Amino acid sequence: MYENGISFIISLLICGCVKSEEMMKQHFVLVHGSCLGAWCWYKVKPLLEASGHRVTALDLAACGIDTRSITDISTCEQYSEPLIQLMTSLPNDEKVVLVGHSYGGLTLAIAMDKFPDKISVSVFVTSFMPDTKNSPSFVLEKFASTMTPEDWMGSELEPYVVFSAEFTKHRILQLSPIEDLELRLLLKRPGSLFLNDLSRMKNFSEKGYGSVPRAYIVSKDDHTISEEYQRWMIDNYPPNLVIEMEGTDHLPLFCKPQLLSDHLLAIADKFS
């Protein structure tokens, strides 16, 4: 009788430890920016996984190895469909850590508005972060007004986004390893800002998008979305947490993946 009681207690303790470990594990969902793909997280993904977490890196529509063409995608919601499908498939009791880079911030916002109860925190990595008072296109339109034609260094924005090699080298990846620059140039695909569509969309809601905890990671040496503009978005719609990264360009996931991974782990732990 006594031995059975001890065995029962030990079983409870073991089950409790296993359950505790499972609860500590996070599910990170990594969302790339315009003209990129899931491949751009190739340095960060294994670092998060090495810490024992589950990681999903998505190709959005017409990105990475997704077979669709950008000419067949007319709305930001269509573009974001792979993330929406993933969020729909999650069990109701599972919460993920959403991480969006650059234009991926708009995709995050769409998912946050639809699935606020399935997200523990959303992390905006030097990305566009909309508010709930203005049109979803507002942060893009204001950003565009800060750029001159010369600033784009021969890049195309209409009808589709194609960043020039010069812009990529000097404004996007100026601090990243040359191998990552070459990879970016080899794997580039045209994108879209979907400005017309976003300008017609309803504002993101406080009940949905606004109810999800947000963290913003500032890249201080970003020459694409400048630190000044990142801080304007932060002031415009303050997140719950702001973290700075020095010595990083527009792709800290390339130039300082370990530091970025450490920040993501700390944020996930804080909001778990």
Curated annotation (Swiss-Prot):
One of its GO terms (molecular function) is hydrolase activity, acting on ester bonds. The active site is at 102 (acyl-ester intermediate), 222 (charge relay system), 250 (charge relay system). Pfam families: Abhydrolase_6 (PF12697). Its EC number is 3.1.1.-. Keywords: Hydrolase. Gene3D superfamilies: alpha/beta hydrolase. InterPro entries: AB_hydrolase_1, AB_hydrolase_fold, MES/HNL. It is an enzyme of class 3 (hydrolase). The keyword Secreted does not apply. Methylesterase shown to have carboxylesterase activity in vitro. Belongs to the AB hydrolase superfamily. Methylesterase family. This is Methylesterase 8. It comes from Arabidopsis thaliana (Mouse-ear cress). The gene is MES8.
